From Swiss-Prot:
Listed transmembrane segments: none
Tagged with keyword Protein biosynthesis: yes
Gene3D superfamilies: P-loop containing nucleotide triphosphate hydrolases, Putative DNA-binding domain, N-terminal subdomain of bacterial translation initiation factor IF2, Translation factors, Translation initiation factor IF- 2, domain 3
Name the record gives this protein: Translation initiation factor IF-2
Domain tr-type G as annotated: residue spans: 466-635
Main location: cytoplasm
InterPro entries per UniProt: DNA-bd_dom_put_sf, EF-G-like_DII, EFTu-like_2, IF2_assoc_dom_bac, IF2_II, IF2_N, P-loop_NTPase, Small_GTP-bd
Region (G4): 575-578
Amino acid sequence: MASTTVAQLAAELSRSAAALLEQLQAAGLGKATPEDIVTESDKTRLLDYLKRSHGQADDSARKKITLTKRETSEIRQADSTGKTRTVQVEVRKKRVLIKRDEAGADQHNEAADQHALAAEAAEQARREEEERQQAAELARQEAEAKARREAAEREEAERRAKQEALEAEQRRQAELLARKAEEEAAAARAVGEAAEDASRKKAEDEQARVAVERAAAQKAADDAKAAADKARAEQDAARKRREAAEAEARAIQQMLNAPARVLKAPSERKAEEKKAEQTGTLHKPVKPASATATEAKAGDKKPAATTTTTTATTTADKKGKTGKPGSWQDDSSRKKGSGLKTRGDSSGGVGGWRGGPRGRGGRQQHADDGRSNFQAPTEPVVREVHVPETISVADLAHKMAVKASEVIKQMMKLGQMVTINQVLDQETAMIVVEEMGHKAFAAKLDDPEALLVVDGEEHTDAEQLPRPPVVTVMGHVDHGKTSLLDYIRRAKVAAGEAGGITQHIGAYHVETERGVITFLDTPGHEAFTAMRARGAKATDIVILVVAADDGVMPQTKEAIAHAKAAGVPIVVAINKIDKPDANPDRVKQELVAEQVLPEEYGGDSPFVPVSAKTGAGIEDLLEQVLLQAEVLELKAPVDAPAKGLVVEAQLDKGKGPIATILVSSGTLKRGDVVLAGSAYGRVRAMLDENGKPTKEAGPSIPVEIQGLSEVPAAGEEVLVLPDERKAREIALFRQGKFRDVKLAKQQAAKLETMLEQMTEGDVQTLPLIVKADVQGSQEALVQSLQKLSTAEVRVQIVHAGVGAISESDVNLATASKAVIIGFNVRADAGARKLAENHGIDIRYYNIIYDAVDEIKAAMSGMLAPEKRETTIGQVEVRQVFRVPKIGAVAGCMVTDGLVKRNSLVRVLRNNVVVHTGELDSLKRFKDDVKEVKQGFECGLSIKNFNDVQEGDQLEVYEITEVARTL
C-alpha cells in the first residue's frame, strides 16, 4: 500500500498543509511537518474528530437498514352467480437490519478483559496463598525434624554422661582397691623389717603372706576392670541393638511411605531390570557375563521340579522377564501352561510362588519382586471394649474383633450356655471381656439423658429467692401425727381415714403469720418404710412425733434413722401431754439413748411438748420449725423450669394417671411438658391439695397434675423439658433400658434359679394379684406380703398395679389361678361378672394389716400338717402260738393304757426295736374286739411279722396330724 504524506492529503482535500496539520494535531495525531506519513487509521481518527467538532452524530440510517419485499399473485375465485373472477393478491415483507454498536462491543470487550484480569489476579493470589501454606508446612516439618534431632542429641548426651559417670565410678573403685592394697603392702613391709632381726624365717613367712595378699589385691583390681569392661560391652551391644531396631523401623516406615508401584511397558521394565542386573544389590551381586549367558541358555529349557525353596526361586529368576504380574508375556505363559508343576510350596509363599488349584502349574503367579519379606510380630492385640448396660453376644464379639463362636466357647467355660443373639448384662459381658484378655470399660454411649444435664446447667444462673421449708411429720403409728397436722391446718383428715391410721403420704402447705410451711404427712405403720424414706428425702426439717404415754417405738427409731441418713434437722414434738399417764421425761431419756439430744442437754434438737387435742404448744412448735428454716437459709430459683419429686401417684378411671408433685425449684405451669421416670406428658390440669384448680406452683408447693402417659413410680424426679419430642425420646429410652436390664438379669439368674428349685423341691405357692389406689400403698402392700414367704409356702406376686380391678386382671387371675386383692379399690361391673363366672376370689381391704393377716392365715392353711406320735398302751407277750395259715399269734397282757385294732405297734426285745408295724387282728377269747384295756388279756397278730417271742414288749402308738401356723 502506498503511503500518504500530509502534503499529499492536503492536496487531495484542496486545503493548505498548515490547516491540515492544525486539524491533525487537534485530533491528537502527532504530525509536525508536511512530510509526515498519514495512515488509514489516522484518517479515520481525523474524520471522527471533524464530525464531533461540527456536531454531527452518527447517521442512524447507516445503522438501521430496512428491506421491503413485495410479491404479487393471482387467485381465481367464483362468486355467488357462478362466475369466476381473478383477484390480485400483494404480499409485502419487511426486514430490518440493525448494525451493532461498536462502542458497546468495545465496552463488552473491556468488561471481559477486566473479568479476565480479576480471575488472573485471584489465581495469582491463590497460588501465592498455596506457596505460603507450603512454606509454612515446610517450616513446621523442619521445626519438627529439628526438635527430633535436638531430642536425639539430648538423649545421646545424657547416655554419654551416664556412661562417663559409670566409667568414672569404676575407675574410682579400682583406685581405691589399689590404694588399699598398697597400704596393706606398706604395713606388711614395716612389720617385716621390724621382725627381721628377731627371726629371718618369720620374715620370710611374712613376705610370703604379703605376696599372697598382693596377688589377691591384684586379682580384685583385675576383676573390677573386667566387670567394667563387661558392663561397657553390654552397653555397646544394647546401643547397637537399639540402633539396629531404629534403622529397621525407619526402613519399614520408608517402605510404608513409598509410592505404589505402577505397571510399566515391557521396554521400560526390561531397561530397569537390565540396569538392576548391572548395578546389583546386597543379596544379588553382579554376575559375570559368562554366568549370565549360562543362565540365559538354561532359561530356554523347562526347569525341573525341585523340593527346595532356593532352587524354585532361582529357576523363577532364570525364566526371563516374564515373572512379574501385569505383563503380556506373563499372560501368554499362563495360557501355554508353562511354569513350575509342584505339589505345593513348603516355604509358605516365601519364594514368591503360589500353586493353583489341585496343584496345576497353569494358575501359578510370581509375586512382585518389590514386596518386602518383613512380617509384623504376632503379639495378641489388647483392645479397649466399651460395654453398655446390655449387649448381645454377636455385638460383643464384634467389639473384640473375634468370632461369636469364641465368645460362646468362653461363656461355656464360665458355665453358662448362650446363643449368638442372647443379651448379656453389663457385669457378665465385662467378665467375658477380661477373661479373653481385653480391657473392659462400662460405657455410657448414646444416652439421651445427657441432654438433661446440659439443660440443667443452662438455668443454674437464675436468681435464688427464699422458699418455704418442707417439713415431714414422722413417728410411730397412732402417735398423733395426722391429728397434729389437722389442728395446724384446721382440718379433719384423721377422722375420715380407715382404721384411724394414715396409709397415704399427704402433702399440704399452711400459711401462718410467720410464713408458709409445706407439710408431708407420712404413714407410721411398719409396712410403709419406703414411703417414709421418700418423705425424708424430699424434706428440709423433720418433726418427730412421740406419744408421751407410749415412748420410743420401732417406727420412731426408723424415722430417726431416715432423718439422719437424709442429714436434716429434727424437731421433736412430744404429743398427748394432756393424758394423765403422760411422762415427757421418760420420752427424753429414751430419745437420748437413740442419739437425739435436746437443747437443754447440750444437743441441737428442740423438744416441744404439744397436744393435738387441746392445741397446747402448737405455736411454739411452728416457731421452732421456722427458726430452723431461717438458720438453713433455704433458697431456690423461681424463674426457671421446674424440678420436683413424685410424692404419690394413682390411676383415676376418668382422669387417667394422677401424680402428686412437690416442686423443689422453679415454677411449674399448666401446659409444661414434664418427665417423671419413664412417664411423660403435658400438664393438662393442676390442682392444689384442696382440689382447687391452679395455674402455677412455685418452690416447696405440692400440686396434683394430670396428663401423664402412665402412672409414675413414687419417688421419681420430675423435670420440665422444652419440647415433648425430647421427653418422649428419654422416656422410651428409660423404658427400654429398664426392660433390657431386667431381661438380662433374669437370664443371668436362670441357672441359679434352677439350682434353687432343685434344692427346694415341692414348694407351695400362693399367687396373688394386688391392685391399690396409689403407688405407695401398692408398693408397701407388695413388700409386706413378700415378707410372709417361707421355705414351704411362697407368695408369688403375679401382677401389682394402681387403679380399679379390671377384666384383664380377672383374665390374668384365671390363667395363673391367683387371688385378687383390692386395697381401697373396687372391681367394675364387667370384672365382677367375669370373676363370678370363672370362680375367681376377689378380696377387698382398706387397712393394710387386715390384708396381711388374712394372707398369713391362708398361707398357714397351705402348710403341711405336723404329724405327732402318741403312745396309748404297753403290751407284754406271755405266750406264742403257731397257727397254720395264720402264723404266730401272741397271747398278751395289757400292762398300761389300751390296745386298739389296727393300731401301730413297735416290737421291743431287750429294749431294742426289732420291728415296727401294724396289728393284723385283736381278739379276746374267740371274739374280735375293737380295743382291750389295761389288766386284760388278749391275743393279737402283727402284719408281716412272725418272729414274736415270749417276753417281748409291744409299744402301741398312734399318729395324729396337727395344723401348723406361720
